[in-house]
């Protein structure tokens, strides 16, 4: 219940005494649906356009393009879950049934871990191509079958990381109100494992990989004078920086909740502060889904031209004067 537990505050606050639960719930009912709706609309349009560009104009057997496509696909899966969480926050009751509780949790987690793993893969692919150009590992995967198999493996990893929480998600009836939550077996270590997994796979592993790879890539690019290569690495670095700026606060709060689970910070004030903080940092983290398309549009000239080319095909009267040649 790390990312949904503020929906069932009534079940949690009694452990440590009363605190101002109503103020947190009122804030959730007003703030979360509006923010989730904005993120969903902006993110779905942007990532949908990215997917269209990559399918229509790019070679999906190319590993870089395949990573970008699956990154957009991960964001789309993540975004599809937001209308359900928005409704859940607004009415404080889950009305979609047990199957959808599992399904929406799966979309959320697959999108989250998919984004991480494909960003890691994209980083390793660029590192191999630049630092080890003579023995480029991914050159052997530049076929539709091989690259698709590697992408499928990333999705299997995402499913493996998500599966425990998908299995343990369930609909419970509390005081005649249905709630979708993750309930771990009594006496098990699954909840602790979930917190640790989220911090390790969500921040520590990707940060370590990216620091290692880009600390070796950047010096090589500093010696080059090819503008296109500079722009390509700039786009990837910006993607990574944005990802960590938006997800680090969330991981910090998750770590604090893990400490609370171990018996630290047990006061009612800490309980309320963490619930309120989770809403803010989780919404910030959700917003990263909107940013990848914006980065492509403003950093990559090629993507900007291809965006406009697609828009010209769909809306010729509006965009005929906007398309420029590369």
Cite the ranges covered by each PLM segment.
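Extracellular TM2-ECL1-early TM3 structural module of rhodopsin-like
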Residues: 25-37, 57-122, 128-141, 189, ...
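Extracellular N-terminal segment of 7TM GPCRs
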Residues: 1-45, 186, 194-195
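Intrinsically disordered regulatory tails of 7TM GPCRs
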Residues: 1-23, 138, 266-268, 301-326
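Seventh transmembrane helix
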Residues: 242-248, 252-254, 276-326
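First transmembrane helix
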Residues: 28-57, 74, 208-214
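Loop architecture of class A 7-transmembrane GPCRs
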Residues: 14-23, 89-113, 131-132, 138-151, ...
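Hydrophobic alpha-helical transmembrane segments
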Residues: 67, 119, 147-152, 196-197, ...
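Alpha-helical transmembrane segments of multi-pass membrane proteins
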Residues: 40, 70-82, 151-162, 199-207, ...
């Amino acid at each position: 219940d790390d990312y949904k537990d503020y929906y069932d505050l009534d079940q949690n606050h009694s452990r440590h005494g009363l605190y101002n639960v109503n103020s947190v719930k009122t804030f959730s009912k007003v703030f979360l649906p509006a923010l989730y709706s904005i993120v969903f609309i902006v993110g779905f349009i942007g990532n949908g356009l990215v997917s269209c560009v990559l399918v229509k104009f790019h070679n999906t057997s190319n590993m870089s393009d395949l990573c970008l496509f699956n990154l957009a696909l991960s964001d789309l899966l993540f975004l599809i879950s937001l209308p359900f969480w928005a409704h859940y926050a607004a009415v404080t009751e889950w009305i979609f049934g047990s199957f959808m509780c599992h399904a929406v949790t799966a979309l959320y987690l697959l999108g989250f871990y998919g984004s991480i793993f494909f960003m890691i893969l994209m980083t390793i692919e660029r590192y191999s191509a630049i630092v080890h150009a003579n023995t480029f590992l991914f050159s052997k995967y530049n076929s539709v079958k091989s690259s698709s198999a590697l992408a499928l493996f990333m999705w299997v990893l995402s499913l493996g990381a998500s599966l425990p929480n998908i299995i343990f998600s369930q609909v419970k009836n509390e005081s005649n109100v249905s709630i979708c939550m993750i309930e771990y077996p009594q006496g098990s270590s699954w909840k602790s494992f979930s917190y640790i997994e989220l911090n390790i796979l969500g921040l520590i592993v990707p940060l370590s990989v990216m620091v290692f790879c880009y600390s070796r890539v950047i010096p090589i690019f500093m010696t080059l004078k090819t503008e296109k290569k500079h722009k390509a690495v700039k786009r990837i670095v910006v993607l990574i920086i944005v990802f960590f700026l938006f997800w680090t606060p969330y991981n910090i709060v998750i770590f604090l909740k893990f400490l609370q689970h171990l018996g630290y910070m047990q006061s009612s004030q800490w309980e309320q502060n963490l619930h309120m903080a989770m809403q803010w940092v989780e919404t910030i983290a959700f917003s990263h889904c909107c940013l990848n398309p914006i980065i492509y549009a403003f950093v990559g000239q090629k993507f900007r031209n291809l965006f406009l080319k697609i828009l010209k095909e769909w809306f010729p009267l509006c965009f005929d004067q906007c398309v420029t040649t590369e």
